[in-house]
Amino acid sequence: MTTDTTGRAGNPAAAASPDRFRYGFLKGNPQLTKNGELKHLLSIEGLPRSIVNHILDTAEQFVSVTDREVKKVPLLRGKSVFNLFFENSTRTRTTFEIAATRLSADVLNLNINASSTSKGESLLDTINNLSAMHADLFVVRHASSGAPYLIAEHCAPHVHVINAGDGRHAHPTQGLLDMYTIRHYKRDFTKLRVAIVGDILHSRVARSDIHALTTLGVPEVRAIGPRTLLPGGLEQMGVKVFHNLDEGLKGVDVIIMLRLQNERMSGALLPSAQEYFKTWGLTPERLALAAPDAIVMHPGPMNRGVEIDSQVADGPQSVILNQVTFGIAVRMAVMGIVAGNSD
């Protein structure tokens, strides 16, 4: 499903670019209220460090909820959260549903395949109808970059929008849970060297992580991957680019591995998965090039034997499953914060 500038189902080539949605019809920062509080979470880009830290601090308070016998707090009691996933997702949709339920919200998961959008209704008409049902918060995943911005501009004033991933553009809650994970294990962002490895070209997670890391003051962010899978402009963002995995991993404190997003590739950008693993897969031998206490992360889904060896994924330096656990607390924090702010 893609949208043109009117929000109707359309040709992928006609889908609006992220820049249009960030800088076209929206002025200022569309995520913030007039008082500078977070009303929507659409992207980490442009958020002040104070808001990012506020989200991480709030998430820390929610982590303990997971260990309680009754895993609920009444923060969103009486609120309705609509999960609108126009792209398939298991992990993200499930963690948002768990997070909303633990905040005592009423949760609706829209069945996109059976919805009016699959029958030709425009995206904006769908959003307007759902707003009329007195939804309080939309969690949106969409194949078109910028779709959550379009929804945030046109939904009812009382509705809040959280971007759960839009095209190649952004995945802000994944970026935030990655930052929470790093902070949990490393504490001081200003002394870290962080490597992001793999298919950065097609990764909305990589973009969100880069913006979050630079916002939080990480002095050295490295992008490591084959030339065909690295976007232009990384150096302008302050990122060091490496085309050799062994060189790029030397001395890093955090390694974020990315899967190959074959569904977003339009041509033969790489050889076989086996050849990719030989050159770009994270093995125990390559992990040894990093700092002795380096942590290994992955946003999932993980392809063992392609971008990461099972010994690394299941090893003592892997914090991949903890990312999932922390993700619930981070998404609770985001929903709780945005739902409490309005113009």
Swiss-Prot record:
Enzyme Commission number(s) of this protein: 2.1.3.2
Any single GO CC term annotated in Swiss-Prot or TrEMBL for this entry: cytosol
Residues bound to L-aspartate: K119, R204, R259
The entry's keywords: Pyrimidine biosynthesis, Transferase
Binding residue positions for carbamoyl phosphate: R91, T92, R141, H171, Q174, G300, P301
Domain of life: Bacteria
Biological processes annotated in GO: 'de novo' pyrimidine nucleobase biosynthetic process; 'de novo' UMP biosynthetic process; amino acid metabolic process
Catalysed reactions, as listed in the record: carbamoyl phosphate + L-aspartate = N-carbamoyl-L-aspartate + phosphate + H(+)
Pfam assignment, any one: OTCace
Pathway: Pyrimidine metabolism; UMP biosynthesis via de novo pathway; (S)-dihydroorotate from bicarbonate: step 2/3
GO molecular function annotations of the record: amino acid binding; aspartate carbamoyltransferase activity
Gene3D superfamilies for this protein: Aspartate/ornithine carbamoyltransferase
Quaternary context: Heterododecamer (2C3:3R2) of six catalytic PyrB chains organized as two trimers (C3), and six regulatory PyrI chains organized as three dimers (R2).
HAMAP family xrefs: Asp_carb_tr
Function of the molecule: Catalyzes the condensation of carbamoyl phosphate and aspartate to form carbamoyl aspartate and inorganic phosphate, the committed step in the de novo pyrimidine nucleotide biosynthesis pathway.
Family: Belongs to the aspartate/ornithine carbamoyltransferase superfamily. ATCase family.
Name the record gives this protein: Aspartate carbamoyltransferase catalytic subunit
Species assigned in the record: Burkholderia orbicola (strain MC0-3)
Gene name tied to this protein: pyrB
